[in-house]
C-alpha cells in the first residue's frame, strides 16, 4: 500500500490530506491561529542553558523564551534530535523507517550533555505562557 501525506499551508488555513493508493482517506482542515496553544509543536533554538535548574530556555517565536527541564526532554530525545538535525536546510534527510534508535536519555543526567546554545530542537507546548513566564 502506498501512503502519501499532503500538507497545504496558507495564511488562513492548514489542510492535511492522507491518501492511500492515490485515494483520499482522510482530510483535516484547521484555521490558522497566531497564538501558542498546548499541544503545538515548534522548531526552536536553544538560547540559554541553566545548569543549576537542569533546564534550558528555547526561542520558539514567542515574546518570552520557552522553558524546558531535563526531565521533559523524553527518553528518545537523542533519536529525535538526530532526525531533526538531518532535516535542516542543506542536509540530506533520512528516512524514519531506516533510522536506528539512539540509547535513551538517562533519568539522572544533565541537560548540558544533550543541549547546547544555538542548537535547533523540536518542542511541544505543555503549558501556555502565564504573566511574565514563557511557555513550557
Protein language model features and the residues they cover:
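Single-stranded RNA-binding surfaces
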Residues: 1-136
Amino acid at each position: 500500500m502506498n501512503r502519501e501525506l499532503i500538507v497545504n499551508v496558507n495564511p488562513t488555513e492548514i489542510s492535511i490530506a492522507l491518501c492511500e493508493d492515490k485515494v483520499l482517506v482522510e482530510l483535516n482542515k484547521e484555521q490558522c491561529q497566531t497564538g501558542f496553544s498546548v499541544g503545538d509543536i515548534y522548531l526552536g533554538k536553544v538560547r540559554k542553558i541553566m545548569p543549576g535548574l537542569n533546564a534550558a530556555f528555547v526561542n520558539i517565536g514567542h515574546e518570552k523564551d520557552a522553558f524546558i527541564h531535563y526531565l521533559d526532554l523524553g527518553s528518545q530525545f537523542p533519536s529525535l534530535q538526530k532526525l531533526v538535525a538531518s532535516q535542516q536546510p542543506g542536509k540530506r534527510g533520512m528516512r524514519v523507517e531506516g533510522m536506528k534508535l539512539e540509547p535513551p536519555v538517562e533519568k539522572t543526567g544533565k541537560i548540558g550533555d544533550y543541549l547546547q546554545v544555538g542548537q535547533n530542537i523540536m518542542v511541544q507546548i505543555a503549558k501556555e505562557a502565564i504573566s511574565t513566564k514563557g511557555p513550557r
